[in-house]
């Protein structure tokens, strides 16, 4: 099963995340199938590859709760249902 989840990177206490499509049995920081965005919780900065995310969601990828809330803020699910 493919999941959309966060991949941690950055320095200690200055963490950032990449939103990735990855096999659900892979490690948190394992090799992703595709990088789909960026999220920095310190500045609340978010950059998303919306066409790539919509494609993965239509293929059946399941977002984690955190990624789901990020995508809802960006109103990505409206584009999936359209």
UniProtKB/Swiss-Prot annotation:
Keyword field: Ribonucleoprotein, Ribosomal protein
Gene label: rpsP
InterPro entries: Ribosomal_bS16, Ribosomal_bS16_CS, Ribosomal_bS16_dom_sf
Keyword Oxidoreductase: no
One annotated GO molecular function: structural constituent of ribosome
Gene3D superfamilies: 3.30.1320.10
Cited Pfam families: Ribosomal_S16
HAMAP family named among the record's database cross-references: Ribosomal_bS16
NCBIfam families xrefs: S16
Top-rank taxon: Bacteria
Gene Ontology BP terms: translation
Any one GO cellular component localisation term in the record: cytoplasm
Name of this chain's protein: Small ribosomal subunit protein bS16
Family membership: Belongs to the bacterial ribosomal protein bS16 family.
């Amino acid at each position: 099963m493919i999941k959309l989840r966060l991949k941690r990177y950055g320095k200690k206490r200055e963490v950032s995340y990449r939103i990735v499509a990855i096999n659900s049995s892979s490690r948190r920081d394992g090799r992703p199938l595709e990088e789909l965005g960026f999220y920095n919780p310190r500045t609340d900065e978010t950059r998303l590859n919306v066409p790539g995310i919509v494609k993965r969601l239509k293929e059946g990828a399941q977002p984690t709760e955190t990624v789901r809330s990020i995508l809802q803020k960006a109103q990505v699910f409206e584009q999936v249902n359209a």
